[in-house]
Amino acid sequence: MKLLEDRIKKDGQVIGTDVLKVDNFLNHQVDPDLMADLGHEFYRRFSNEPITKILTVESSGIAPAIATAMEFHKPLVFARKHKSLTLKDHLYTATVYSFTKKTSNEIAISRKFLSADDNVLIIDDFLANGQAVEGLMDIIAQAGATLSGVGIVIEKTFQKGRKLLDEKHVRVESLARINAFENGQVIFAPED
């Protein structure tokens, strides 16, 4: 998606050889107009699927996921990383490792928000090693729901996440695919 690639070139910051900082439009400060465009593009790519729920992990996946949910006119459910007094019983849970934070978290979704009747579209901000998506897939399986696909805002093709999902025959649609970071610059994969 050229609009997103242009925004990454303009405002993204490469850190080392494997981290892209996009905190001024995606995962700290959020550009609502860009999120609307991302949601529209995910809808365009997945509108042929019988989606009943949009699923993501808090917190950086929420903005593009809510924009997508608005396009589909379907509920967004986000997995919580921290249990609270209101989220402690009757849960689906999975453990996920955060590539950026280098920590593991148990994510949880209340059983009342996901059932075997659901067709789920996962939306997330990044695909690196695929841990967040795998955790959400585990929760979908626990609920007996159907995974309709995965929408990723930014995919790092040089990490193992896509390969992991391809091996499981999961449909993945990424709006920006990055092949490498070289000399502080983002090298994008050619669009299909």
From Swiss-Prot:
Record carries keyword Transcription regulation: no
Binding site for xanthine: 20, 27, 156
Record bears the keyword Ion transport: no
GO terms assigned for molecular function: xanthine phosphoribosyltransferase activity
Subcellular location: Cytoplasm
A cellular component annotation (GO) from this entry: cytoplasm
Binding locations of 5-phospho-alpha-D-ribose 1-diphosphate: 128-132
Domain of life: Bacteria
Stored SUPFAM superfamilies: PRTase-like (SSF53271)
Pathway in which the depicted protein is active: Purine metabolism; XMP biosynthesis via salvage pathway; XMP from xanthine: step 1/1
EC number(s) stated in the UniProt entry for this protein: 2.4.2.22
Catalytic activity entry: XMP + diphosphate = xanthine + 5-phospho-alpha-D-ribose 1-diphosphate
Any GO BP: XMP salvage
Keywords annotated in UniProt: Cytoplasm, Glycosyltransferase, Purine salvage, Transferase
One Pfam family matching this protein: Pribosyltran
Top-level enzyme category: transferase
Location, primary (coarse class): cytoplasm
PANTHER family with a match to the protein in the record: HYPOXANTHINE/GUANINE PHOSPHORIBOSYLTRANSFERASE, XANTHINE PHOSPHORIBOSYLTRANSFERASE
Function of the molecule: Converts the preformed base xanthine, a product of nucleic acid breakdown, to xanthosine 5'-monophosphate (XMP), so it can be reused for RNA or DNA synthesis.
Record-stated family: Belongs to the purine/pyrimidine phosphoribosyltransferase family. Xpt subfamily.
Subunit details: Homodimer.
Name of this chain's protein: Xanthine phosphoribosyltransferase
Origin species: Lacticaseibacillus paracasei (strain ATCC 334 / BCRC 17002 / CCUG 31169 / CIP 107868 / KCTC 3260 / NRRL B-441)
The organism's taxonomic lineage, starting at the top: Bacteria, Bacillati, Bacillota, Bacilli, Lactobacillales
